[in-house]
């Protein structure tokens, strides 16, 4: 059988395109080299808990079109992201808000907090030369030392004085007691997990798992008129211009025979000495309950470690610096010349996408491609 579209990758971008193409009467084949669908939003049920296998995914958006679209495929709960920062046993509220400033300095009013921050920002004069100076110019020395420095150095594997200032364009400072990390109109987690949501998107569509497109490119290309490719753009071209860099993350998952490990979905460890950047306790994404509303007796945690990416590792975050940007531009030129191939998604476009921007991007592409 000849398909209208071969979709490479069953993450959000690939699954949504496949769904929309099928809805327009097109025949679609989806292939994925992993043994499961859903890409990095894949959740796996263990001990009654939906475990985010590739790191915490909290859906948030201000885009009503995106929200109305994705909620057709899952009911979302009311989870809001309120991480806690642990600095050597001192707990602080994230984002930086009045709870943070009260704990740090004993200030009680927004005016007192503003005065304290302004006082500390004065340390930096002129244009910040590196990330350390940039952070201090935004939030002052105390918050930088306890809540920014160690965490950032673990994430990037480099001293803050060696990192460019542009990495931290802004550090949201809130002069309220609002603990909601995202300023988003719509927020939540799909009830029953993301995998179920992607299953609904792919309903009635042929999916072949454990299928590496690049290893079987010629025979798979022959099956379809057009390809939608959501894998790494440099891999598609055999890395012939060089390798695009990513930051990677490693997870250590542990099942514990206790009902509650840390009392919150996410705790960031902001000192340099603790080797992990944060611990996720997955059950709190769904309020510690199973689908029938019963308390879950066990818990599952994931310790998250930032690591330098090397070929073969899972690519997570594109390193959008000048060098990689220029290399991507060259690959993009090659991609634009490929006939019958659409490159999309985080890896296909070498772009840091949140889930909502991925959805917006693929819906825009569908309008152009399928209308």
Predicted regions and their residues:
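N-terminal Rossmann-like FAD-binding beta1-loop-alpha1 element of flavoenzymes
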Residues: 3-30, 366
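N-terminal FAD cofactor-binding segment of flavoenzymes
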Residues: 56-90
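Glycine-rich FAD pyrophosphate-binding loop
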Residues: 19-47
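Short glycine/proline- and charge-enriched loop/turn segments
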Residues: 45-53, 179-181
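Short, solvent-exposed loop/turn segments at secondary-structure junctions
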Residues: 12-13, 35-36, 99, 153, ...
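Mid-domain catalytic core of redox enzymes
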Residues: 24, 214-334
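Active-site/ligand-binding neighborhood in enzyme catalytic cores
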Residues: 85-92, 98-226, 230, 235-237
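C-terminal catalytic lobe of FAD-dependent flavoproteins
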Residues: 314-371
């Amino acid at each position: 059988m000849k398909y209208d579209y071969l979709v490479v990758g069953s993450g959000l971008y690939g699954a949504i395109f496949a769904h929309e193409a099928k809805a327009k009467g097109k025949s679609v084949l989806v292939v994925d080299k992993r043994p499961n669908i859903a890409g990095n939003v894949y959740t796996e049920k263990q001990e009654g808990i939906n475990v985010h296998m590739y790191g915490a995914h909290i859906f948030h958006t201000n885009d009503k079109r995106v929200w109305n679209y994705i909620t057709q495929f899952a009911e979302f709960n009311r989870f809001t992201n309120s991480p806690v920062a642990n600095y050597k046993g001192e707990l602080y509220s994230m984002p930086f808000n009045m709870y943070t400033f009260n704990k740090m300095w004993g200030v009680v009013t927004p005016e007192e907090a503003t005065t304290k921050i302004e006082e500390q920002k004065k340390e930096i004069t002129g244009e910040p030369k590196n990330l350390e100076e940039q952070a201090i110019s935004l939030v002052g020395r105390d918050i930088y030392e306890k809540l920014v420095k160690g965490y950032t150095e673990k994430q990037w594997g480099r001293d803050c004085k060696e990192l460019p200032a542009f990495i931290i364009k802004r550090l949201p400072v809130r002069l309220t007691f609002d603990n909601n990390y995202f300023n988003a109109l719509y927020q939540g987690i799909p009830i029953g997990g993301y995998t179920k949501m992607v299953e609904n998107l792919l309903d009635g569509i042929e999916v072949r798992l454990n299928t590496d497109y690049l290893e079987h490119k010629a025979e798979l290309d022959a099956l379809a008129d057009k390809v939608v490719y959501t894998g790494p753009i440099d891999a598609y071209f055999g890395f012939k211009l060089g390798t695009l860099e990513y930051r990677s993350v490693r997870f250590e998952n542990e099942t514990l025979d206790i009902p509650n490990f840390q009392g919150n979905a996410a705790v960031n460890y902001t000192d340099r000495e603790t080797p992990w950047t944060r611990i996720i306790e997955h059950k709190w994404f769904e309020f510690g309950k199973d689908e029938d509303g019963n308390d879950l007796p066990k818990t599952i945690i994931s310790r998250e470690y930032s690591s330098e990416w090397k070929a073969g590792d899972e690519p997570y975050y594109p390193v959008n610096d000048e060098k990689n940007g220029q290399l991507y531009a060259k690959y993009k030129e090659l991609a634009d010349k490929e006939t019958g191939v659409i490159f999309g998604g985080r890896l296909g476009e070498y772009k840091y996408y949140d889930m909502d921007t991925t959805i917006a991007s693929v819906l825009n592409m569908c309008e152009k491609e399928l209308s």
